[in-house]
Amino acid sequence: MKAFAQRLENLHATRPVTVLGAAVIDVIADAYALPWRGCDIELKQQGVNIGGCALNIAIALKRLGITAQNALPVGHGVWADIIRNAMAKQDLHSAVEADTGDNGWCLALVEPDGERTFMSFSGVENQWQQRWLDALHVPQN
């Protein structure tokens, strides 16, 4: 394990890194059963987490001390504000800001046996625009 930790300490990027992808909100709730048509069930909230594969990678790179250009669309709205504030607390910023629309979120229902069911609401992270990509600073090979 020591050898692995030492390798991580010496890790560095040989080329500029760009992280391209989504930042979303995960609302996680315990459910005694999945809802069926016409029912009304009580949920117990476990937590609200900021997620998305690209955001998780951006956080990991930051912790490793690797500078990255983060292209994670952040919009305007309740969810976007939560994402923007969470990123700022970790000194992360996105090079992509959507003019309109909020970020997406996911409701994860967790049954007593641990099985998870997801209901996702797409936001600006799924509305990519060519001008966002054109504005990124990605050097040629």
Q: What are the language-model segments listed below?
A:
Residues 1-71, 81:
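Glycine-rich phosphate/adenosyl-contacting loop at the front of the ribokinase-like
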